[in-house]
């Protein structure tokens, strides 16, 4: 298949709000992919690169786009050719590797037309927002293969990713899907939580009574034990066993020889409060001297679910049954603090205690719900205290997919009184309605200080925006050394001037506090 065909499918999917039309277009594209293109094609249609990041940053992509010839030339790029080129970019290493990656990218863009360039750039930047979420794509795989959507979703849940399931479904049908099952030692995608505004809303949504557990500000882990063999996986399903000897020791000491447990690993201070998230994440670097780091930065594991315990797979079991199995598998000090209640006042006090002890908040869980691996289901609801800052828009990037034609991704900065300038803290495209996107595009075009046909448009720092975020982390990417976690736009503050924006000292105070 030509890349241009896939780019056109992406454009069409982004352009329609109709779920059934999205599914139909994606299913047709999946059917047309050659067998050796199905895995990569399914990944790209989901907006992902099969191997994750490939060593090219946003600045390089934008510079390559700006330098590309006005019109692409040569024969049309195929999916296989592009996949091979991206593979060469990902594996380039050593002296001169940055130049080699750039030359490969330049060669791709030189052969690509405008739609293909936008598709490639959005894919490389992780910004292919076309409304083809995994649920939509799973339904498209089911339609393309003539299989029940529930079976495709279950296989994807157990595989931890949809592309291998797409390959199996399209190549082997139901027999291919039957191979996907929970195996101790092989990770499954973790269950995720939706958001509730407060504990009262969470209790109402869950039918009155629910289990509340502390939401720890740590690293999600999935721990597997099969006899003497222990493996630990991250939220992204990466094997991190070597990085967490403390967790390995806990599993080996457990009374049950066969376990799959879901939980968090966290670095704690002497007073029991958590270190900042970024400090915990130092234990999970890819180049890590664990023997040197572990004594100074030990990890503590807290578990909150059992997927395999007592000789049984528990995915379909109610939450209360899985918790009882967890109680038998690990001692109380290795489980998250928990409260079962229907009393909003009691739930509120539990939340305040978690926050006072430095945790993110609580997760409310339906007692009779199964474990929905890989889904952000309504059976788990997180309640956190969000922070807000008034920041200034420093630049914006043109959107892709259904946001094409709008300035979407905002560069956000805090005021620096010492220089009179602004310090960038991150970017966000989240929280914006279509009306807000249309309004801000016109305002930012009027404030532009650079060409409007560039990928990124710098603007005069005049617009103040109220931004909600979940925390602050250290980041070498930005000049102030700090970045916002999960930032999203709440509203523009037209009543405020840039000099009324929050200062970098305020941000540093929040980080230190």
Swiss-Prot record:
Catalytic residues (UniProt): 215 (n6-amp-lysine intermediate)
Key words of the record: ATP-binding, Cell cycle, Cell division, DNA damage, DNA recombination, DNA repair, DNA replication, Ligase, Magnesium, Metal-binding, Nucleotide-binding
CDD domains per UniProt: Adenylation_DNA_ligase_Arch_LigB (cd07901), OBF_DNA_ligase_Arch_LigB (cd07972)
Gene3D superfamilies in UniProt: DNA ligase, ATP-dependent, N-terminal domain, DNA ligase/mRNA capping enzyme, Nucleic acid-binding proteins
PROSITE patterns, per the entry: DNA_LIGASE_A1, DNA_LIGASE_A2, DNA_LIGASE_A3
UniProt-annotated binding residues for ATP: 213, 220, 235, 264, 304, 376, 382
Enzyme Commission number: 6.5.1.1
GO BP: cell division; DNA biosynthetic process; DNA recombination; DNA repair; DNA replication
Pfam families: DNA_ligase_A_C, DNA_ligase_A_M, DNA_ligase_A_N
Top-level EC class as recorded in UniProt: ligase
Reaction(s) the record says it catalyses: ATP + (deoxyribonucleotide)n-3'-hydroxyl + 5'-phospho-(deoxyribonucleotide)m = (deoxyribonucleotide)n+m + AMP + diphosphate
Reported function: DNA ligase that seals nicks in double-stranded DNA during DNA replication, DNA recombination and DNA repair.
Family that this chain belongs to: Belongs to the ATP-dependent DNA ligase family.
Name of this protein: Probable DNA ligase
Native source organism of the sequence: Anaeromyxobacter dehalogenans (strain 2CP-1 / ATCC BAA-258)
Name of the encoding gene: lig
